[in-house]
C-alpha cells in the first residue's frame, strides 16, 4: 500500500455507505512484498503443479500430499500465521493473493490447501491456546 494511508471500505460497507474512489483498494496498492509472494506462488504452481495437472485431477493423493509438504516448506501454508507461531505473519492481503493463485491452478490441490489453511490452521491460530499455537 502507498505511504498515504487510505480509509479503506471494509467488507460490505460499500452497500450502506458512500465511498470515495480514492478509498477503494486495487491491485495497484499491493506492496512489493505482496507482489513477490504472489510471484513465488505462481512460479511454484508453474513448476510443481501444472506439469502434473492430470495426476492431481485423477486423485493422486500422494502427489497432493507431497506438493502440500513442498508448499509448507516454502511457507505458503503459513502466510497468515503470526511469526511467533512459525508462520510468515503477512496479513490478509498476502493470504488472499496466495489463495487466489493456488485456487486457480487445480481443483483438488486448492481444496487440500483451503482445508489445511482455512479449516485446520486458522481456527487453531484464532482460538487455540498458547500450547496449541
What are these regions (language model features)?
Residues 87-88, 131-133:
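Glycine-rich, Trp-frequent "lid" loop and neighboring beta-strands that shape
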Residues 49, 111-131:
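N-terminal glycine-rich flavin-associated loop
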Residues 1-114:
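Amphipathic, small/basic residue-rich leader segments at the start of a protein or domain
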Amino acid at each position: 500500500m502507498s505511504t498515504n494511508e487510505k480509509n479503506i471500505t471494509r467488507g460490505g460497507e460499500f452497500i450502506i455507505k458512500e465511498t470515495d474512489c480514492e478509498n477503494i483498494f486495487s491491485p495497484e496498492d499491493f506492496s512489493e512484498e505482496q507482489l513477490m509472494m504472489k510471484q513465488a506462488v505462481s512460479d511454484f504452481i508453474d513448476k510443481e503443479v501444472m506439469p502434473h495437472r492430470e495426476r492431481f485431477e485423477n486423485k493422486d493423493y500422494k502427489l497432493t500430499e507431497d506438493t502440500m509438504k513442498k508448499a509448507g516448506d516454502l511457507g505458503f501454508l503459513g502466510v497468515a500465521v503470526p511469526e511467533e507461531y512459525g508462520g510468515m505473519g503477512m496479513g490478509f492481503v498476502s493470504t488472499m493473493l496466495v489463495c487466489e493463485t493456488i485456487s486457480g491452478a487445480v481443483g483438488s490441490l486448492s481444496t487440500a490447501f483451503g482445508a489445511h489453511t482455512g479449516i485446520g490452521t486458522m481456527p487453531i491460530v484464532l482460538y487455540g491456546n498458547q500450547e496449541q499455537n
